[in-house]
Amino acid sequence: EIPASVETIEATAFKGCSSLATVTFEKGSQLKTIGGGYYSYSSSYYYGAFCQLKNLMTVDMSACTQIETIGECAFYGDFELRLFKIGTEIPPTCENYAFSGINPYSVLKVPSGCADAYKAATEWKRFASTTGLDE
């Protein structure tokens, strides 16, 4: 469980944590930013905070109500990501490829009454279905 006091998760924070299957955030989370990035010259290098974690299946950010930005490639290549919950009512800004390569059957759960806003927002459209947290 990531402590409520964390405001930023930097790029590559979980790089190499291949056994990580679930990420949860403590109630009252102050998280505002999840870092990321991408570099390409002769070969590509992705450095999102949670990118390319082959066993990551669930991210529960339902306690996070203040997210502003999800960085480039933050969850890139998380092929097993099936459930993503977020408590922020206004869809956070997602930079390029934030959710590229996630499971094609992935579910996004958002605060009640906010599903349409997430469905219309760039990058959030990558989720197969979007429903309320209470559904």
Cite the ranges covered by each PLM segment:
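Structural signature of tandem-repeat unit edges
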Residues: 1-8, 18-33, 41-45, 51-69, ...
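Helix-loop-beta element that forms the nucleotide-linked donor phosphate-binding surface
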Residues: 121-126
